[in-house]
Amino acid sequence: MHINTPVLLAIIYFLVFAPKSADAWWLLSKTDTSSANSGSSPILCKNVPGLTPQQKRMCHENPNIIKYLISGLRSALHTCEYTFQREAWNCTLTLPGVGTSPLQIASRESAYVYAISAAGVSHSLARACSKGLIDDCGCGETPQGSGSVAVSQASSRSSSDFVWAGCSDNVKFGNTFGRKFVDQYDRQHATEPRSQMNLHNNRVGRRLLVNAMNKECKCHGVSGSCVTKTCWKVMPKFDEFASRLHQKYQLAKLVTNNDQKLTVRSSPSAGSSGRSERFARNMDASSKQMRNELIYLDASPNYCAIDVKDRECGENCPNICCGRGWRTTREIVDEPCHCQFVWCCEVKCKTCKKLVERNYCL
């Protein structure tokens, strides 16, 4: 299935919405970053309407950091579209024929987009830091007090012995800079229910990224032996993280505004169990139990009102096509086959023809 570019999605979105909003910074996703580096300081944000003075200042003072922030935003939108490609809402930012967008509605879809965008920015900045691409940051912090120490004699050590070393992804920097930039508008309107929702979901995205970090290790020794093992912390691939966040989307909690405080309502969430709903009933959205849960204020729009004609629906046609039926086509495609490893270091493949079936909504 062809995936539309996230840049195009963002452009379409901002043709629909007034940029004077919490979403104005998304306009950066269509900004040309090719000349942004530590040696030159083009004002990447000068033509982006709706940014706060603080965002404009950060953009002017940190062009190289903003370049990777933009890259993270683009990655988030692209990954969102890929994750939802087989669902009724495929992460499109406009609803043809409806005259609105999911992001104008404080829905579970909006909750996911905010969370994935905040995490995408942090992911991109954290990885750029660990690669030495940003002068203002370096490797992430090394965990302390692990109690696992490598020993000199391989025969007397267990496979779990290691020392923290190497270069961890700097998620702390990514989250800190991302929060200061992305959350700027909503922090200034923190008494408004929609801004409270946005800030909560941004925090969830960043917190889940930290929680998803894994230990990666490398052995050191003669002839492949593991006399010493060093380990560091790395983030998961972003598409893997997006899949985990999708589970949170399915279990997102409906909240209501109660005297400028968001409270979880006892309304069923997609894929949730009655037990989990009873547990969350009448719970403050800022409570400890809700720290890792997405929240939303409004029901989702009717995605069956969208013109889905000719949309590829895969194995989920009854849901995506909304009962309008679908057609199946058979196509011959080229794909690599009979691949062989050629020393050193190349993989050579032949090209084979394959008959595939594709389903499209009527």
UniProtKB/Swiss-Prot annotation:
Lineage here is: Eukaryota, Metazoa, Ecdysozoa, Nematoda, Chromadorea
Phenotype upon gene inactivation: Embryonic lethal with severely defective embryonic morphogenesis with the formation of unspecified differentiated tissues, no endoderm and excess mesoderm. In addition, embryos have defective mitotic spindle orientation in the 8-cell stage ABar blastomere.
Q: Tell me which UniProt keywords the record has, alphabetically.
A: Developmental protein, Disulfide bond, Extracellular matrix, Glycoprotein, Lipoprotein, Secreted, Signal, Wnt signaling pathway
Q: Please explain the role this protein plays, according to its UniProt record.
A: Ligand for members of the frizzled family of seven transmembrane receptors. Required in embryonic development for endoderm specification and the correct positioning and orientation of the mitotic spindles and division planes in blastomere cells. Involved in cleavage axis determination. Binds to receptor tyrosine kinase cam-1. Together with wnt ligand lin-44, plays a role in controlling vulva precursor cell P7.p lineage orientation during vulva development, probably by acting as a ligand for tyrosine kinase receptor lin-18.
- Where is the sequence biased in composition, kind Low complexity? 265-274
Record Pfam families = wnt (PF00110)
> Where is the protein situated, by its record's location annotation?
Secreted, Extracellular space, Extracellular matrix
Q: In which tissues is it expressed?
A: Expressed by anchor cell and vulva precursor cell descendants P5.ppa, P5.ppp, P7.paa and P7.pap. Expressed in the tail and weakly expressed in the vulva and body wall muscles.
> What's the chief localization of this chain?
secreted
One GO biological process this protein is involved in is:
motor neuron migration
Glycosylation site residues: N90
Signal sequence coordinates? 1-24
GO MF annotations in UniProt: cytokine activity; frizzled binding; receptor tyrosine kinase binding
Q: List the disulfide bonds.
A: C80-C91, C129-C137, C139-C167, C217-C231, C219-C226, C304-C322, C313-C317, C321-C361, C337-C352, C339-C349, C344-C345
Family, per the entry?
Answer: Belongs to the Wnt family.
Q: Where is this region: Disordered?
A: 263-282
Lipid (O-palmitoleoyl serine) attached at which positions? Answer: S223
Post-translational modification comment from the UniProt entry:
Palmitoleoylation is required for efficient binding to frizzled receptors. Depalmitoleoylation leads to Wnt signaling pathway inhibition.
UniProt name for this protein: Protein mom-2
Q: Origin, by domain of life?
A: Eukaryota
Q: Which residues cross the membrane?
A: none
Annotated GO CC locations: extracellular region; extracellular space
